[in-house]
Amino acid sequence: VAIGTELAEVDLWRNELGHSCYLYRIDIDPECLSDEHLSDVAIRQRADITVAKLSEMMPTSFSDWDASSVLNQKLVWRSEIEFDRPGIIEIADALREALPKDTMIFSDMTQFAYVAKEIWPMSLPGHWHHPSGFGTLGYALPGAIGGATARPNQPTMAIAGDYGFQYTLQELGTAVELKLSLPIVLWDNGKLKEIEDSMESAQIAPNAVI
């Protein structure tokens, strides 16, 4: 059951889904429902409405996961993330503690955002916006400006890397013109660190990352 997902290569990290069962697709985009994955059952509907109806139809069941099992699994995930991108989790935790729970976040393609959006428990749905899939550099600032304009007097924040921020730096003028209170977290490691790390892990000499 695929709900609101393109099943893109960046979602699967492989070219094909590789399933051997029926595929049920639920999406509001008709192109997703008729793409190369060839769903057996396609439902064009909003995810929240469909999931709510499915939940009403499902028999009552209970998970064998208890609170300690969930906590232990979270600790395993955090340790894996810390191993891949060391030194970021603690900063993300501190930032989360400092922000109001209803803060709407717009993040760019940067290692800080990659870590934060995996370990940051959100209090409200629809409050973290990230350019997943296409991976657009420069998204965070204009996205946050739009979010802050649409939600006046409510907390909004942008997270960007030092390279991605330069793509839409000029939009700071728009934020000033609109008199927005818009904090920007700039993760500055002086390079395209994620690309450098990927090259090194693939045993490729880093090139054009600074």
Located regions from the model:
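Active-site diphosphate/adenylate-binding microenvironment
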Residues: L71-N153
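Thiamine diphosphate
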Residues: E177-I210
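Short beta-alpha connecting loops at secondary-structure transitions
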Residues: D35-V41, G126-H130, Y167, E196-A208
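Short glycine-rich anion-binding loops that position phosphate/pyrophosphate groups of nucleotides
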Residues: T5-A8, T110-F112, Y163, N189-G190
